Amino acid sequence: MFYALVHYPNIETSLINDFRCKYDPNKNLIEPHITFVFLVPESVGETSLVLHIESVLTNWRTFPIHLKGLQKAWEHWLFLILAEGNEEVIRLHRELYTGILAPYQRPDIEFVPHVGLGLFARKDANYDIRNPQQLSLDDEKYFQALEEAQRLALDYSCVIDKLHLVKISDDVSEIVWSREFVLSA
């Protein structure tokens, strides 16, 4: 079992979900989200993790974000990126990866605040969520999806006001909500 900390943007997600139905292998596992803490093993302990998150969040207030723009990341993902609020999300991400989470930070993977839209790995590749960079890009499928996403002109504004701790099964076949953290207004 693993834990992750995510934000579910309070936006109309029908266009994103329709797109993800075609291209995102995780579409049925989790709603469109921004990940603040990636997979952390349950051995860290839920109580310790919750206390750490609460401690970090005591210094944070709600803040606006603007989702607009597309970016290829980790060589095979298409992301809806932040046009506003990027610095705040990165700063909060870094603060969360202190203390008990410091050993789990992945400096080898660039943190790009985003909503994942699709995975474009060649069919012969096996995707490992714990090591997302180890795939080859399916160029044809990626460029087709990129054109489609550009036509959608995805553009959303919302506020980061809550983060959600989720539990993820070892085989990444099930994600269960665990706890909500509300930022001060």
Regions found by a protein language model. Give the residues of each.
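Active-site-proximal alpha-helix that buttresses catalytic centers in soluble enzyme cores
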Residues: 164-166
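Short, basic/glycine-rich phosphate-binding loops at helix/coil junctions
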Residues: 71-79
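Basic, often amphipathic N-terminal segments
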Residues: 1-66, 72, 83-162, 171-185
